[in-house]
Structures are given as structure tokens and as C-alpha cells.
Design a protein with these regions (language model features):
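Protease-domain processing segments flanking chymotrypsin-fold serine proteases, especially trypsin-like
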Residues: 1-28, 204-245
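Chymotrypsin/trypsin-fold serine protease catalytic domain
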Residues: 93-96, 101-160, 164, 201
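Short conserved beta-strand and strand-loop elements enriched in small hydrophobics
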Residues: 14-16, 53-63, 123-129
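Extracellular/periplasmic catalytic domains that process cell-envelope and extracellular macromolecules
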Residues: 6-9, 28-29, 48-51, 89-93, ...
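Conserved catalytic-core segment of clan PA serine endopeptidases
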Residues: 1-8, 42, 47-105
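Catalytic histidine site
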Residues: 9-56
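Catalytic nucleophile loop of clan PA
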Residues: 159-183
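Short beta->alpha transition motifs characteristic of CBS
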Residues: 37-40, 180-189
Length: 245
């Protein structure tokens, strides 16, 4: 999106800067909750969760300027996602995480997206993401195709690249898209390059319950907000073959 006006209605999609170690895409689903891929919130080598306060959500980022910026306060990654294992259908199915922010972002700045909860999403979908070569501005593929859904894993022909991980895949429902899935990985299906994601309602419900079971103290909001960091490298969609271990 080359103009700030192009962002209208899409401000809730932002870049997740990972303490200078790359970035992913995240989306507000509540004023203080960002939805992204689980593999984005893990340290690659240590296979442990990144410190929440080292993750910076930059809503509606364009040319170095965000609509709003917040640090992470708490992370919930799906317990059935295994960061120690290579990409697989099992991991794609559970590659979901929520990040609670230190302070809500008001709806007048960025209106959170709803989750698609039905089965009849149709085959026409869209994706909005940051990625290699377009890290400073949100890029939106307005039309791509849902190819197949099986065992809570979705395949689509949307263009995914490094940095696209965690990007929302939208079903066209009513006047505003609803989040159908997240970009988890890229791979091959019938010799075609495709993206893979997962169904979301059950996973998100489980992650919200996890956050409620493990509450953390909200910092004093009188403290000055932390400033934006930089994320020069990219941490993005993995390229795998379906069923690969």
C-alpha cells in the first residue's frame, strides 16, 4: 500500500519486530491482543519463547511510521506447536499465538478484525502482510484462492514470502473481511507453490483460556511508552512439502 490513505480500514494489521532478529506480521483481534504465528514468538536456537517485551507491534506501519506501537506483555503459544520440530502438517495446524500488549490500541486508531467462525468461507480470499522487499509498507493481495481444507489445515495460492509469517488470510464476509487463517508456511501442492495455514476458532479459544489462567500484572500506564526498534532481517513463512517431517 503506497499511500497512507490506502491503509484506511487495515490499520489493525502491523509488523511485529523481533528485537532486531527479524519480523513477522500480526493482527489485532482485540484492542490489546495480537494474533500471529507461533513460530514467530519462539527463539529459533533456544526453542523457548521470546521475552514478550522484546516484541514490538507496529500497527499500520508505513515508511517507518506506525499508527500505534506497543510492546508485548504476555505471550500464549499453542501447546501443541513444537518449536523443536521441522515444519509439518501437525505443526501448521497449531502454529498460532496471541500476544497481549502492554496497553490497548484504541479502535479509533486501529479497529480489530473479527475471526471467521463458519465453514462457508467460499474460495476467494485475500492476504495482507509485510515481507522481504516490502518490509516498510503493508502489501495486500486482493484476490487469491482457497485450494483445499483438510483436518484443520488450509492450502491457498496467495503469494507468501519471508516476513509473511503470521499474516492474516481473509474470507470475504459482508462489508469487511474476517480472518480465516494465518500464513504458516509455504510449500508444494501438486507441483504448485502454495501457502499453508490453519483454521482458527478453536485454537484462539484455547489461547485466550491460557492467557486467563496465567495472568500478568499490567505495567503502570504513566510510564512513557517504549520507542520503536528496528528489524532488518526477516523471519518468515517456511517452505515445506505437505506432510514433511
Amino acid at each position: 500500500m503506497t499511500d497512507r490513505d490506502d491503509l484506511l480500514g487495515w490499520e489493525a494489521v502491523g509488523r511485529l519486530d523481533l528485537d532486531g532478529r527479524g519480523f513477522c506480521t500480526g493482527t489485532l483481534i482485540a484492542p490489546d491482543l495480537v494474533l500471529t504465528a507461533a513460530h514467530c514468538v519462539y527463539e529459533r536456537k533456544a526453542k523457548s519463547l521470546r521475552p514478550a517485551d522484546k516484541i514490538l507491534f507496529r500497527a499500520g506501519l508505513r515508511d517507518g511510521v506506525a499508527i500505534a506501537e506497543r510492546r508485548g506483555l504476555q505471550i500464549a503459544a499453542h501447546p501443541d506447536y513444537d518449536p523443536g520440530q521441522p515444519p509439518s502438517i501437525q505443526n501448521i495446524r497449531h502454529d498460532v499465538a496471541l500476544i497481549r500488549l502492554t496497553e490497548p490500541i484504541t479502535s479509533r486508531d486501529a479497529d480489530p478484525f473479527a475471526i471467521h467462525s463458519g465453514r462457508n468461507a467460499g474460495t476467494e480470499i485475500s492476504v495482507a502482510s509485510y515481507g522481504v522487499g516490502r518490509a516498510e509498507a503493508l502489501s495486500r493481495q486482493r484476490s487469491c484462492t482457497l485450494l483445499t481444507e483438510r483436518d484443520d489445515v488450509i492450502a491457498f495460492d496467495c503469494n507468501v514470502t519471508f516476513g509473511s509469517s503470521g499474516a492474516p488470510v481473509f474470507a470475504r464476509v459482508g462489508g469487511r473481511g474476517r480472518i480465516l487463517s494465518l500464513v504458516s508456511a509455504g510449500g508444494k501442492l501438486d507441483s504448485k507453490t502454495v501457502g499453508f495455514g490453519m483454521t482458527l476458532p478453536q485454537r484462539i479459544a484455547e489461547l485466550k483460556a491460557q492467557l486467563r489462567r496465567n495472568p500478568v500484572a499490567v505495567p503502570d500506564r504513566r510510564i512513557k511508552r517504549l520507542q520503536a526498534g528496528t528489524g532488518r532481517n526477516s523471519s518468515g513463512a517456511r517452505f515445506i512439502r505437505p506432510g514433511g517431517g
